[in-house]
């Protein structure tokens, strides 16, 4: 009798963004938490239905939730859906992470960092943080690279590394399902 060969099933994760920094953070977090799984990571463009630059904690979280909902509607059948939305409140920037499956939801907010006064002043002109950072620091498309985090920490941290940690925290209900009732 021939040996039984177990095929690993590739599990699909839809990331409600095509931003490389966000996609890399999701890839890194899932690979860290579930090292024995094989994943297919698919970044998709879906609306957040909030301002291009959310200016409150509540609006930012709602943007991440909306991204997950819209990704589920447009791309059914994935095992996980991940929405990430960066925002600003007062003088700080942060991001919300929402991870959903059919049975569960996890959420977490990233660490926050203070923004320079000149950046905050220019943000009042209804611009996105990435665009303002490019103007002030003379960079190009920083939001898809290290982000404001990378610039302001002199690359000791990046957008992806900070999001990685927050995504692992959002995965807690999936790591410990016995302690979290299904959504």
From Swiss-Prot:
Enzyme class: hydrolase
InterPro entries recorded: ITPase-like_fam, Non_canon_purine_NTPase, NTPase/PRRC1, YjjX_NTPase
Enzymatic reactions: XTP + H2O = XDP + phosphate + H(+); ITP + H2O = IDP + phosphate + H(+)
Free-text cofactor note: Binds 1 divalent metal cation per subunit; can use either Mg(2+) or Mn(2+).
SUPFAM superfamilies in the cross-refs: ITPase-like (SSF52972)
Record Pfam families: NTPase_I-T (PF01931)
EC numbers for this chain: 3.6.1.73
Annotated family: Belongs to the YjjX NTPase family.
Annotated protein name in UniProt: Inosine/xanthosine triphosphatase
Species: Vibrio cholerae serotype O1 (strain ATCC 39315 / El Tor Inaba N16961)
